Amino acid sequence: MKTTVILLLAIAIIFAIMTTLTSAKNEETMEEALKGLNELKERLKKQGIDTAALNLDEKLLT
């Protein structure tokens, strides 16, 4: 149950980052979004959750 909630939260955060990047007009915003994605990945790794899907999203963003 806890893992499901965390994964749903991660998906929501990824969607928010993707939306931000779609409307981003400068590179600072993109860098902040990528930094946020990396921080999310680190938190999920500490909890033992696979972050392979997030790696795909990061490749799409760059």
From Swiss-Prot:
Expressed by the venom gland. It is found in: Secreted. Keywords: Antimicrobial, Secreted, Signal. Belongs to the formicidae venom precursor-01 superfamily. May have antimicrobial properties, like most ant linear peptides. Its main location: secreted. Residues 1-24 form the signal peptide. GO terms for cellular component: extracellular region. This is U-myrmeciitoxin(01)-Mg3a.
